[in-house]
Amino acid sequence: MDGDVVSVERVIPAGPAAIFALVADASRHPDIDGSGTVQQVKPGAPQLLGLGSTFGMSMHMGIGYSTVSTVVEFEQDRRIAWQTYPVGFLAKFVAGRIWRYELEPTEGGTLVRESWDISQDHQRMLLRLGRLPEKTAANMARTLERIEELVTAP
């Protein structure tokens, strides 16, 4: 963990546009999620995300809960990030983390970097403790594997 950010990266043998189209489609997030917590997009999410887009997710990590996210960074085929807040009681305790994807064309495909940025989270000090950063990095590595599987499938 570099300060308040955990990042993983992988070269995926596909162009940035194909990868970005997958990541910028909130309805596909359950398909790419390597943690198993993202269950389904809530009704009303835009077909493709853009700066300022808001979307909700049904989540499950021990218990079911809902989140709402807003796209806070957007550069077509290069970068997308959304800030996530739980809905309801949990929002008082854990809220504000940013999930970011950065894509760089490279030899053999695209370097994809996923980051978990807790610099604006209400409980960032608590989130740094224990094995959560390590566990999050492992889940993000699985997410990048799933993205590769989906964009390279015949």
For the regions a language model picked out, list residue spans one by one:
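Alpha-helix N-cap/helix-start motif
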Residues: 31-32, 64, 92-93
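Hydrophobic/aromatic beta-strand elements that line small-molecule binding cavities or substrate pockets
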Residues: 8-10, 67-73, 96-105
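Beta-strand/loop substructures that line and gate deep hydrophobic ligand-binding cavities in soluble
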Residues: 86-138
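Residue-level preference for beta-strand/loop junctions
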Residues: 2-4, 51, 63, 95
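Glycine-rich portal/gate segments that line the openings of hydrophobic small-molecule binding cavities
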Residues: 41-90, 111-113, 142-154
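Hydrophobic ligand-binding cavity/cleft-lining segments
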Residues: 1-45, 143
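A structural signal for well-ordered alpha-helical scaffolds and beta->alpha junctions
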Residues: 16, 64, 96, 133, ...
